[in-house]
Amino acid sequence: MAAGKKDVPCARGRWSVEDIRSSMLLYAVTDRAWLRGRSLADCVREAVEGGVTFVQLREKSAGHDEAALLARELKAVCAEAGVPFVIDDDVALAAEVGADGVHVGQSDMACEEARRILGEDAIVGVSAQTVDEALAAQAAGADYLGVGALHPTPTKPDAVDVTMDELRRICGAVSIPVVGIGGVDAASAHELAGSGVAGGAVVSAIFAADDCRLASAELARELAKVVAR
C-alpha cells in the first residue's frame, strides 16, 4: 500500500444507537497472549461464528506495522459477518485501516477529538468507572460505554473495580448502551441480570478457550438470558 494511503472505510453509514445496542451482546476484546500460537484472525472468525457480536482489537505489544496487519485481517473477518470492528485507543490506526471506530479510555484521546478525526459515521466507545464519567462521555458524543472492571482479571490487573451497584447506577443514568467488562464469563454472566447492560465484554473466556467457537456460543447463550433488551 502506498505511503499515506488509507484503506476504504467499512461500507455503511452512521450506526444508530439501536444498531450498536443490538451488537453489544457479546463483545470480544482480543489478546494474543492467550492464543498459544494460534492465528488471531482464525480465532476471531471462530468466535464470530459462535456468537460474538462486536470485536475490539487490543494488542498493546504490537508495533504499528503488525497492528495494521492484524487490523486489516480482523476488519475483513468482521465485515464479512456484519459485526462492528473497533480498535483500542489508536485513532490514527483506525482511520488508516478504515475500522468501524475506536474505543478510548479516560486517559486516551478525548471522545470529541476521536470523532473529529474519524468522522460522524464512526463508532466511538469510551471507558467509564463512575456515573460522572459516564455522563461526561455521553455528553461528548460517545456511542457506547465500557464499564468495569466488574471482577479481578489478569488481563488488566491494575483496572479500577466497579461494583454491581455502580454499574446499575451508570446504566440508569445514560441512554447509550453499556457493556460490562472484567472477569465476565459463562459462570458469572448471571450477575449482570437487572443491571441494564446491553452485553458483556470478554477477553480470556473466549481467547484462552481451546475452542473459541464453542466458548462464544456458551457465553452468548448465558448473556442472552440476562441482558437488557
Question: Residues of each region from the PLM?
Answer:
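Internal alpha/beta core interface subdomains
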Residues: 195-199
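A short, polar/charged loop-to-alpha-helix boundary motif
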Residues: 108-111, 153-154
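Glycine-rich beta-strand-to-loop/alpha-helix junction loops that act as flexible
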Residues: 147, 179-184, 200-204
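A short, flexible beta-alpha/helix-coil linker loop
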Residues: 32, 150-153
